């Protein structure tokens, strides 16, 4: 059995494919798995590190604007797409994959299109509540489309082969709240706020939490992933405390979630998959410059479900926003209700479910 994954650029587009690949290896001895990506994406280093074959394509995203420079650049980019499509057609003819799986990013388009034109089975896995243009166009000819949010279904008309299976996410062993708090050296009797803005941090969130710290002191535990760029500045400005853990990156993310009563973070698809799988209430601050504002759509899906509160990036540093966060932290009943709502939106085992669908398609 041969499977080709096409996706990357960011971890959000790569790691769902990696999770599916791992599940396929468990189920199909001797399976051949390859990835298609670009030299500029995270896959250029991660895929070889994980031991998978990587085929690189020159495809890039179009530039916005109508300037002469943008028009010239876009003409070159369209040329790269045509070259990538030709390369993809040749790869599909040579490799004869049983299924091509698209997980988003620029490289998905030429690979999925080449597979569809060659009569191969294709599966699209969409992470976000607001599907991208490529997904919406190629879904028409895809064998199956798998979504992370029920709200996304409306973008695919009457297509019957559309399923809500969730977004493959990291899985963490179950641990007691007390043992997780002990790991970070925090007070078991206090509510705990977990803050992160991605592996590199988020400046707006960090600056807001820096202002919020004086209101948390002595009444709320704080576990704060600042990202590497802000770690020293944040530590230097607020110093140490028995109720704070501050670091550039949280290696033991499962323990951080286990300790947390409330999570403050961006609204990326992977983070939301983890929050819902674990049943964690959240305050979401969508990244305002995400493509097609997709993080706001992601956040609204959880807000509508009663699992989250959304605060605009431009308002996160206001006292009124701090009031919302502190009010939630003091209301255990509300947090429990939000946590249950989050859990109802979760799809634990999404990677395994998708692996089974890929196997079924290869046999059909």
Curated annotation (Swiss-Prot):
UniProt membrane topology term? Peripheral membrane protein
EC number(s): the record gives: 2.4.1.227
Name its pathway: Cell wall biogenesis; peptidoglycan biosynthesis
State any GO BP term from the record.
Answer: regulation of cell shape
From what superkingdom does this record's organism come?
Bacteria
- Catalytic activity of the protein: di-trans,octa-cis-undecaprenyl diphospho-N-acetyl-alpha-D-muramoyl-L-alanyl-D-glutamyl-meso-2,6-diaminopimeloyl-D-alanyl-D-alanine + UDP-N-acetyl-alpha-D-glucosamine = di-trans,octa-cis-undecaprenyl diphospho-[N-acetyl-alpha-D-glucosaminyl-(1->4)]-N-acetyl-alpha-D-muramoyl-L-alanyl-D-glutamyl-meso-2,6-diaminopimeloyl-D-alanyl-D-alanine + UDP + H(+)
Q: Does the keyword Oxidoreductase apply?
A: no
Give the protein's function: Cell wall formation. Catalyzes the transfer of a GlcNAc subunit on undecaprenyl-pyrophosphoryl-MurNAc-pentapeptide (lipid intermediate I) to form undecaprenyl-pyrophosphoryl-MurNAc-(pentapeptide)GlcNAc (lipid intermediate II).
Question: Could you tell me what this protein is called?
Answer: UDP-N-acetylglucosamine--N-acetylmuramyl-(pentapeptide) pyrophosphoryl-undecaprenol N-acetylglucosamine transferase
**Species of the source:** Chlorobaculum tepidum (strain ATCC 49652 / DSM 12025 / NBRC 103806 / TLS)
Instruction: Identify the coding gene.
Output: murG
